[in-house]
């Protein structure tokens, strides 16, 4: 935070800077989340979600839905490619349970991205590089702002479930993994 002080002449506590940056990020994300209510399934959502939707309509059993998702993965194993964990999640797209649930897609993907980014930054910067917690969180929020605002296609990255789960959600999961690696490396240095 000394750099901020040098650039602006302001001397703000790190916690205050965090809350200011968080407020800016919330303002940036608010329009993205407000339009989520208009989000509807499209394209591959129907293909991957058809068996699970049929299972839900017939039984209203989560076990049957998961079984249908596993069946979709098995079908793709024989006929297509090897992104099985992604295909399992694609078969569980929210509209399987009703079109109104599709509005949750940007919340799920942004949530995974935000959680992964914050965990990674906290792990890397505080555990491995020795910075303060508030500094690491400010870096995470700035990174999250850049990720969300400069994405080439917000529709494919946050709103279209199959694209968002395949890329954005798994990127968030990957950041968790890198955070665990950073913590592992930091524990080895002790």
Residue ranges with predicted function:
Residues 1-29:
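Start-transfer (signal-anchor) and selected internal transmembrane alpha helices
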Residues 30-80, 90-92:
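Extracytoplasmic loop-helix module adjacent to an early transmembrane segment
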Residues 108-133, 176:
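Transmembrane-helix motifs of polytopic, lipid-linked glycan transferases
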Residues 14-19, 77, 128-140, 190:
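Membrane-interfacial loop-to-transmembrane alpha-helix junctions, especially the N-terminal start
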Residues 183-190:
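Short hydrophobic alpha-helices at membrane interfaces in multi-pass membrane enzymes
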Residues 74-107:
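Short hydrophobic/aromatic helix or loop-helix immediately within or flanking a transmembrane segment
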Residues 90-93, 105-117, 166, 170-173:
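Transmembrane alpha-helices of multi-pass, membrane-embedded glycan-processing enzymes
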Residues 44, 132-183:
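Membrane-interface micro-motifs in multi-pass membrane enzymes
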């Amino acid at each position: 935070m000394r750099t901020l002080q040098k650039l602006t002449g302001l001397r703000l506590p790190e916690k205050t800077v965090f809350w200011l940056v968080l407020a800016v990020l919330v303002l940036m994300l608010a329009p993205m989340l407000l339009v989520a209510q208009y989000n509807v399934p499209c394209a591959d959502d129907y293909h991957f979600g058809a068996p699970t939707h049929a299972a839900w309509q017939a039984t209203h059993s989560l076990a049957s839905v998961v079984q249908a998702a596993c069946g979709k993965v098995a079908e793709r194993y024989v006929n297509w490619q090897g992104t099985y964990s992604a295909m399992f999640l694609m078969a569980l797209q929210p509209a399987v349970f009703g079109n109104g649930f599709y509005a949750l897609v940007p919340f799920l993907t942004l949530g995974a991205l935000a959680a992964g980014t914050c965990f990674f930054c906290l792990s890397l910067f505080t555990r491995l590089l020795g910075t303060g917690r508030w500094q690491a969180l400010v870096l995470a929020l700035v990174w999250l702002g850049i990720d969300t605002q400069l994405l080439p296609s917000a529709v494919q990255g946050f709103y279209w479930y199959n694209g968002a789960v395949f890329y954005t959600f798994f990127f968030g999961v990957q950041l968790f993994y890198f955070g665990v690696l950073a913590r592992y490396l930091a524990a080895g240095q002790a």
